[in-house]
Amino acid sequence: GSEMCIRDRSWEVCNKVGGIYTVLSTRAKTLQEAFKDKVFFIGPDFWAGKENPLFSENENLCAAWREHALKKDGLKVRVGRWNIPGEPIVILVDFYPFFSKRNEIYGRMWEDFKVDSLHAYGDYDEASMFSYAAGKVVESFYRFNLTENDKVIYQAHEWMTGMGALYLQKAVPEIATIFTTHATSIGRSIAGNNKPLYDYLFAYNGDQMARELNMEAKHSIEKQTAHHVDCFTTVSEITNNECKELLDKPADVVLMNGFEDDFVPQGRTFAAKRKKARAAMLNLANKLLGLTMSDDTLIVGTSGRYEFKNKGINVYLESLNRLTRDKNLKKEVLAFINVPGWVGDPREDLVERLKSKENFTTPLECPFITHWLHNMSHDQVLDMMKYLGMSNSAESKVKVIFVPCYLDGKDGILNLEYYDLVLGNDLSVYPSYYEPWGYTPLESVAFHVPTITTDLAGFGLWVNSLKGRYSELKDGVKVIHRSDYNYSEVADVIKDTISEFSGLPENTIKTVRKNAADIACLLYTS
């Protein structure tokens, strides 16, 4: 029989930026088990001459083809394995040589597919040259190693990968192409620009909005790829609505994001890691705030990309501010915002204190941030905290700490990886306004941490569909109704939910935690 070969291509292969890294890295093990080494991931080679901690090069892998690709096709690639569960084969491609040919490439894309790259700026050139290079790599590999009898699928993720998929549609039509959009660039932009996305979705014209928002190139590649590939998919019904209205093409299939549970520790290891994470967060609070917070403190957190409105960071802060005046709150609250900003260095004064075993009784200056930012006076989180008068005073029942860096275990302050920290939370809050799927609340419940999300997140809608009603706190996921205009109500419901959680007896919390984990189990791909 013929061989099945899958090519999975994304900007976030061996390159951690956001949720798509999670999508790819957590399904690699399942794909490896099903197809062994017939699955190849293709990513950008940003690390020339430097060590990429996510990539282990192996010069024996595909050695003959690599030499052929370089000599005959002028393609410089490195082959190795991705350091994640499943350890799939990865091809990293050096796409910089294509920059000199970009006008010619864009010209062909216009002639063949009406992709309009005329107004390109920012990351468009870089993403498109990588995408095109990846398409050339697949063509080269296919012609060297395979025949027409071999079934090959090429899956491209997001607009950044569209050009490669279109190149293959024309150059090697026998390769089946799938394009998966995890959001629409125009939908995300409308939402982030304070325009009402949902009530008026039917009235927006994608092409017109692209002009208005100066996003014509990204929108064009996304739309034309959706229309021209063999199969177009997206991650949730809520995003499929955007595809219909803004790309003028519904998805052929809605493929919800699956999930691996390998990185969720079990049994005693889980308990030990949770204890360590809580101790680290409470110790950080002491060193930064000069206060001793009890083991009984309710730790809540949010995390994700720094999209202040879209991710609901604004409404999270609003709710925490209202919580300070809530008479029903039964515990002290320590709230974290783990969102990478324009981060500079870890604070030296805080690093010094963290070296000490002493219990501190005086706060540091700015006792609400762990690393200095390059834009301390123009940061949305800090601006809103200042506007609301949130200063972490000793009298306040709610303390907020902003950790504005990637939690990779080497941040200089907490020095814990994200997954080793998230399980220390008691409750997580993801009140998104724009969230096509919602990995962060899903990761939270996988770590037995109940979560608050909204019905504008694909994940929130999915949980509601499981329950046949709005999911409540007792179910492990509280889904709040959110619309274009009910910001204040959402803030109140978050406040009330945290307050309600603070009064739950221990045995009820155990049940809620179990219910949360059970929801995640339904999405495990293994």
Predicted regions and their residues:
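Catalytic cores of nucleotide-sugar-dependent glycosyltransferases that transfer UDP/GDP/TDP-activated
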Residues: 2-526
